[in-house]
Amino acid sequence: IDEHASRLLCRFPDNGPVPYYQSNYYTWPDGKTEHRDFPAEFRDKRVWWDNELIIGWAAEVPLDKYNRTVMLYWQRTGDPSLYLYEQIQISDDGQNRCRTWHWIRNGLLETRTAIQEKFVTKDWLAVDKEMGNKI
């Protein structure tokens, strides 16, 4: 079992190289840290990623009349045998979301990931400044 803290910073810049830019910051109890960036494009009512780590998309689920569900698919760039489907559930007040990942290798379930998140702020510019980020 891998348990760690994460902070996701999702940006929608008015000007910049891409319309969506996500940075993930991970911290493990032993002090290990990791930072990954995921720039993305919008097209066909989806967010699309294509970078050195993943190729994939995220989209709202139109069958959900409550607009609580987003589905995501991605494949590891260097490993075509491994792909992932993620279901994201957003609370009605927009303050929480839970995510479930199914990692599939060669058509078989390899592992599951469960994530509980809490919304912090819409002011991603202030967070970027606080963290010293530049995109």
Walk through the language-model features, giving the residues of each.
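Soluble ligand-binding/transfer domains with enclosed cavities or grooves
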Residues: I1-I135
